[in-house]
Each structure stands twice: as C-alpha cells, then as structure tokens.
Amino acid sequence: MQKIKVLCVDDSALIRSLMTEIINSQPDMTVVATAPDPLVARELIKQHNPDVLTLDVEMPRMDGLDFLEKLMRLRPMPVVMVSSLTERGSEITLRALELGAVDFVTKPRVGIRDGMLDYAEKLADKIRAASRARVRQAPQPQAAARSADSAAAAPMINNPLVSTEKLIIIGASTGGTEAIREVLTPLPPDAPAVLIAQHMPPGFTKSFAQRLNGLCRIAVKEAEHGERVLPGHAYIAPGHAHLLLARSGANYIAQLSDEPPVNRHRPSVDVLFRSAATHAGKNAIGVILTGMGRDGAAGLLEMKRAGAHTFAQDEASCIVFGMPREAIALGGADEVAPLADMSRRVMARLATMGDRVQRV
C-alpha cells in the first residue's frame, strides 16, 4: 500500500520534529519533507508532490494565510492547518477554511506527554481524511460578493416561520464550517431556530459563531446552558460540551453537557440528534453535512423514526463523504441534496408543514 506523503510546514523546529515523529509512527503515512516557512515549502512541493500539507498559521517571511491563498489558486491540494488555541488563532483558522483548507488541528504541546496519544490519533485521522478530500479552489473576490448578494436576495417564504415548534438540527465535521455557512446565509430572519453540532475544539466555536453572525440574516451565537431556543437564531455547540435540545413547559431550551465524548467527539452530532428525536419529533428537520466518520448517522435515523424529515449532503458536494454516507447507508436520510440546494430544500419542506405543529 502506498503511504500518504505529508509535507510539514512550521517555523518551530520542535513542532516540525514532533509532527514528523507522530506522522511517521503511523503505518499508512510518511513525512517526505519539512519546511520552516512557505518559501522553502514552495520548492519542496515541486520536488516531492505531497498528498497532504500541514501548515502553520503564523510564520515569518510569508504568513500561512497568504501562502494558502496563493497555493489554492495556483496548485490546489489538501491542507490541514495547525493553529494555536487563541482568539486570533481561531479567527485566522476560520479564514483558512474559507480559503480552501480541508481541516485544522491545534498545535501539539511540546514537552507534555499527557493526551499525546489522543492528539496523535486525531492528527492521523485528519491527514487520512484530507488525503481523500475534495479540494476547493480559493474563492475569487467576485464570487464572494455574488454569494453575499444572493443571500441578501434569498426569497422569503410566504408563511412566516415564527413557531418555536419548528426546528432545524444540523451536524457536521470536516469541511463543515463552510458547509454550515452556505446553509445558514440564505435563511430569512424569521426562519425556525437552528441547533448545530460542529466538531471543533474549545475556543474556536465562539469565533465561528461570531463570524457567521456577521454574514447571516439570522442571529448566530454559541449556545448557553438553559437558554430559550428562539426563531431567527442559530445556536452552535461550544467546543467543550455536548449540545442537547430539551423542553421547559411549552418552550424549547438548550442544554450543555460535559458527559464523556460520544463517537470520540464532544460535541457529538449523535447526542444532539437524539435529543431532537426525543423532544421535537415531527417538528424538526435533521441535516447531516460533510464530515469523516459516522457521528450523527444513528442519530439522524432516530430523528427520522421519530417523524422528523431528514437530509444528507450528497457525495459530489462533500469535502469528506463520511458522515452523510453512513447516514444514507443506515436509511436515515429522507432526501440526499447538493450543498448549494440544501437551504432551499429545507425551507421548502418547512413551508409545506404549514400549521401542522405537533406537540410531543
């Protein structure tokens, strides 16, 4: 079996050494070269033709974002960003995902062995997924402007969807930040409440919510424990907790849980979907988007069995066709839709629900 060829780009010799040690310990991948900055990396890419690039966010001579933008325009390839757990680091990482990076990992903590096995497993999984990922070219400025214009001009649904009884429940992983943006930006201000579980570490989900809030016509925020779930709002699971839907009388509320990871994830899509199956039933729409693994597949099936209408993103538009594929294989998806049409299909389905609000 041919090994996945990886090029590691980081200005820290210690980080380059640690990443090399982790990657070379895997049976199916190898580091073909390392580079201290993007200018050296540019020549090594020509020489080694790597399958995956790991790229530090902030470096001398040329920062990671500038290099990524040029790379995705001139020679698109799978890139996994390596980021620090800081507010600035999370904002830059989200911008990198917009520019076409497949995924990101936090920097390994040099000299601290606790948690290193878990980190190594996550890094290897992300590199494997990236090697199979569908790579997007960097968006042109005109395309971004058209996207914003189309979101502003998205048609309103004739029947205002203001009932808290209707909910959109979304789960995603690898490639999900951009997929979620594409689903949320066309939603009208009176759309039903949206609850989202996106696999992200602590510290990144708040920046993700803030970025979406500036792009969407609905309000987007990081979910808080016990808050009421309202129409026209989207609630993103914090990176350290499971997000669950619950009821308080006639109202829906968000609950956060620090229970152990499910499917190796916290937040877990399955946890969110199962809570929606229990407390929303026929009043919910379930959507599973791009991502590796199977988290959310069983939960989407539970939502469907509880009466919810369910969607899975199609293979052609997924960065990684893992979670949707598993959901489809289990029979959990009522419809399979391309990402570009997902928001319209969801809103059209909600419009057909009319006043058929079911109490559960």
Swiss-Prot record:
GO BP term, example: chemotaxis
Q: What PROSITE patterns is this protein classified in?
A: CHEB, RESPONSE_REGULATORY
> Which is a Gene Ontology cellular component entry for this protein?
cytoplasm
Per UniProt, subcellular location reads as: Cytoplasm
Annotated catalysed reactions: [protein]-L-glutamate 5-O-methyl ester + H2O = L-glutamyl-[protein] + methanol + H(+); L-glutaminyl-[protein] + H2O = L-glutamyl-[protein] + NH4(+)
The record's comment on protein family reads: Belongs to the CheB family.
Give the protein name, as stated in the record.
Protein-glutamate methylesterase/protein-glutamine glutaminase 1
Q: What species was this sequence derived from?
A: Burkholderia orbicola (strain AU 1054)
